[in-house]
Each structure stands twice: as C-alpha cells, then as structure tokens.
Amino acid sequence: MAGRRDRIQQLRGSRIAIAIFVGILIGCVCSVLFPNGFFNSGSSLIANEERISKSTSTDGLASCESSERVKMLKSDFSIISVKNAELRKQVRELTEKVRLAEQETENARKQVLVLGSEIKAGPFGTVKSLRTNPTVVPDESVNPRLAKLLEKVAVNKEIIVVLANSNVKPMLELQIASVKRVGIQNYLIVALDDSMESFCESKEVVFYKRDPDKAVDMVGKSGGNHAVSGLKFRVLREFLQLGYSVLLSDVDIVFLQNPFSHLHRDSDVESMSDGHDNNTAYGFNDVFDEPSMGWARYAHTMRIWVFNSGFFYLRPTIPSIDLLDRVADTLSKSEAWDQAVFNEQLFYPSHPGYTGLHASKRVMDMYEFMNSKVLFKTVRKNQELKKLKPVIVHLNYHPDKLERMHAVVEFYVNGKQDALDSFPDGSD
C-alpha cells in the first residue's frame, strides 16, 4: 500500500511540473506575438480607426470642393445621353432596314432553292404552289441615269410610272392634282416630248426624259392614246431590270387613295379588270350550247373579261420582263391593240407550236380599282355602293374622259352628291 501511495504522489508531482512548463511556454509565445500587450493592441486599433476617420473627413472636404466640377460633368453627361439616344434610334432604324433587306434576300434564296431542288409534298390540304417568283438582281449598268433618279423618287423600290406627251395635258393636270391631294410621293412622268418636260417643271412633278430613240420618239411626240399606250412595254423594261416594281398608270385616272396600301404583291402581274361584276371581273363558267350534238350539246368554257393594260402592277421578275418583251415584239410587227396582246400573252396556255408565258397573276378588287363602267352603270345607282371610296377611278369606258374625271373629283372629293347624275351609262 505504501509503495502505491508513493507512485501516486510522484505522478501528481510530475503533472504539476508539466503544467508549470506549459504555462511558461504559453507566456513566451504571447510575449513574442503581443509585445505591447493585449490592451495596447486595442489602443492601436482605435488609433487606426481615428486615422481612417480623419482620412474620410479629408475626402469629404475634397468632394465638397469639387462639387461644381461634378455639376458640370453631370450637365455634359446629360447632353451626351440625349445625343446617344438619337444615335441609338438611327441605329435601330438602319438595323430594321438591313433586317428587311436580309429577309427579302433570304426569301429569294429560299425560292431559288425550292425551284431548283426536289421536295416532298406535305399532308392533304397543306400544299401550296409557289405564287411569288424571285426578283431579278438589279443591273444599274442598264441605265445609270434612270437608276440615280429612281433611287431618289421610289419608295420601298416601288414607283408609279405615267407615259405622257403634250396631247394629254388637261387630263394629266387633273391627275397630278389628285396625286398631290392624296400625298403620293413616288410618282414619275416619262415625258415623251419637250413640251411635256416644261409642263412637268411648271407643276413641280418629277419627270424622266429618255435618251433619243427613233422608234419610240416618233410615236411618243405625235401619237394618240392607243399609240402611246403601246410604248410602255418598251419603256418599263429598264425599270424592272433596275430592280423596281412598277405601277403603270394611264392619264385618264383619278387617284383617291394611295394604291400602294391596297396591293397584294404576291404575283408577277396585278392588274385592274375591265369586268363590271363578279363574273366578268373574276371569271365564270360559260356554258356553250350546241343542240346538234345531242347528249353532248353543252360545252363548258372558262371566261374572264380582260385585264386592263392602263393600270397594272409588275414585280421585277423574269416572267414580268418576258411579258413586256413578248408584247413589245408583237406590237412592233402588227397594228394590234396593246391591251388585246397583253391579255393574249397572259392567258394563252402552251400548246403545239407555242410556249406560253408562265407568269402568276392577280385581279385587283373591282370596287377599289374601279373602271368607269362599274361607276356609271352600277355604283352611282346603288346607295350602299356610293358610300364606298375607291382607290382609283379609271375613265376607260368613256370618250368624254376629262368631263367625267372632273365629276369624279366633285363627287368623291368635294362631296357633291349629284355630280355623276348628268352622264349617260355609256357614250352618246
């Protein structure tokens, strides 16, 4: 028992010695790490905070001293911000134009791919044929002078073109007044003689005088309505080659609205009709009766009244240019009426010995693009139809054109309800 107590006492003594040693060791470490003591370290932190506070106060004084400079900078920044906003707006507008141009280019590329590659037909009711042919690549070398003029006058690569000589000044003057009244900007007169140039200048209307061409000049300077009308198929070709869509207009037309807001632009040719009702304007099944054939006496035929060659819209496509070439060539070899040839080329199908024109076509709404037969035979006698305001009125069915043009202005522009009443349906 005595030996056991001695071992316990020795163990306690060694523990005390170890504790003393550890305490001394910790004290040495603290003296090295904190030579100024714990409380002096806290004082140092306080001093640092005071230095920081003094520094902040100094900065505050400096900022107060430069407040005027800050105000000037803010004013400059405000001015720059306004200018920057204007520039951003211009960039957005230009970006949108580029996007639209790229979209048109992409659509044309897709059309070429569709036309040049094999495709599979979709499910029933989903297949649609290609109606809108791709436009040609513009070629400014064809007529650099005209290209510069169209770049200034055309809107969205579209232009109204009117061929005129001095024989039609009274009607043209009335048409120009209607164009200005509506606010149409992209309107161009092709002056066929010197007198017409002077007339256009006096009316402040944009005009274009072609380079000398004997074949055109001879007719243009002295020809009547029909002769001049036939020239357009030669003249319009350059417009299409330059990449512009053309809305051809005769002079016996009154503009009451901007026609470009009423076009579909999905076909090569978009034309007003000479028809006077739904059947004649848009087509109908005409049954031919031949009693001698007995059981087969009835033969079905498709009929439509002609497209009017005095007001039509052409997209700059190969079929459109082909149409102009065909009509111009036929007219150069015969005394045919240009409107008859225009429709023959549009509607005759390919058959043995003849290759037809593969152009897509659309008939304009006959109440928007109204001929004078529709107006005087139907519309003026119908109280509901009289409330409609057409886009144009074409006095193509009547020889007393100028008088009726004035009456159209009186009725649709000035509101004179009886302005159309004194005229007969047809001509005397």
Swiss-Prot record:
Pfam families, sorted: Nucleotid_trans (PF03407)
Documented EC number(s): 2.4.2.-
Residues modified by glycosylation: 278
Transmembrane segment boundaries: 16-36
Single GO molecular function: glycosyltransferase activity
Record's keyword annotation contains Transmembrane helix: yes
Knockout mutant characteristics: Reduced arabinose content in the insoluble cell wall fraction of meristematic region. Reduced root hair length and content of arabinosylated extensins in root cell walls.
Listed GO biological process terms: cell wall organization; root hair cell development
Topology term for the membrane: Single-pass type II membrane protein
Lineage: superkingdom: Eukaryota
Expression sites (tissue/organ): Expressed in roots, rosette and cauline leaves, stems, flowers and siliques.
Any one GO cellular component localisation term in the record: Golgi membrane
Cytoplasmic compartment residues: 1-15
Enzyme class, first EC level, given as a word: transferase
Compartments, record wording: Golgi apparatus membrane
PANTHER family referenced in this protein's UniProt entry, alphabetically: ARABINOSYLTRANSFERASE RRA1-RELATED, ARABINOSYLTRANSFERASE RRA3
Domain notes: The conserved DXD motif is involved in enzyme activity.
Descriptive protein name: Arabinosyltransferase RRA2
Gene name of this polypeptide: RRA2
